[in-house]
Amino acid sequence: MNARFALPLIVVATACLSACSGGEPGDAAGAKVLRNLLERAKVPAKLVSFKKTSGRGAHIGNADVYEYQYEAEVQFPEGYEAQCADEKERGPCAALGIASNRSFPKNEILRSEGMLHFSGTEKGGWIGEDGQTY
């Protein structure tokens, strides 16, 4: 094989194998998990932007876990009344990154920061808080 083509081919193959072997959850996985959590909680919202800001992996017992921090912009096309004061589990308010009751007028955009958790699979993927594999 011509040497000038060998190095780029090796770089591309390595990138493909790294991407396919699990790696860390990226922006697409995080955005999908957040959309699914909001939909499941019946929050009438549209994810306008989403960006992973940091993350860290750990090995706990026999499991790999990943803590994923993000910034997001969420729009409420029809408005929304967030009832957070009595939220006892990770529900819509946790997904939105807010802790107290709040009213969002029609089309308001919330800029929020939050955290998602993923658990590793045996095949190298990640299971998000929405129960889906990425």
Language model features: what each stretch is:
Residues 1-18:
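Sec-dependent bacterial lipoprotein signal peptides
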Residues 20-134:
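Cystatin/cathelin-like cysteine-protease inhibitor module
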